[in-house]
Amino acid sequence: KPGHGGVLPAAKITPEIAAIRGVPMGQDCVSPARHSCFSTPVGLLEQVARMREASGGKPAGFKLCIGHQWEFMAICKAMLATGITPDFIVVDGKEGGTGAAPLEFMDHVGMPLRDGLSFVHNALVGIGLRDRVRIGASGKITSAFDMARVLALGADWCNAARGFMFAVGCIQAQSCHTGECPTGVATQD
């Protein structure tokens, strides 16, 4: 959820999830809206470098939805200053998101995918790093046309989940977080 982080309700926490996430059974698992390891663009890039090193050189990057354009430009400036570039950036549109997000946030926080993707692509071209950073696109991609459009706007690949959610029966009841999904897509009991 934009600006809110994520919440996995206690009812959905299995012993396996509790062990992996380090949370007690019977308690909501709250993921903060920001990462505790960094708070600046330079810190973000240093975290990307640490992840790449810890994984033995596997690709490392980050996902974002463009809010204020100057914030991404600060990341671009940090890339130039540090020489650290992510292997990839996934641009999410405000149209994406979760059924647990408040409607006001889903409709009014962040840039639409087309605008955000075009901005990120053009910014990376402008600073001369587009050839070093791959761009993924996500957010309400449901058709072949949606895929072709984001590829034409500069994406190297796209993530498409919504169409698959519909295929397995999602009716967008926006109750994913309640543990009472009417079609069972977000509830496996």
Residue ranges of each PLM-predicted region?
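Flexible glycine-/small-residue-enriched beta->alpha junction loops
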Residues: 1-26
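Short glycine/proline- and acidic residue-enriched helix-loop micro-motifs
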Residues: 26-34
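Glycine-rich phosphate/ribose-binding loops and adjacent secondary-structure elements
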Residues: 35-189
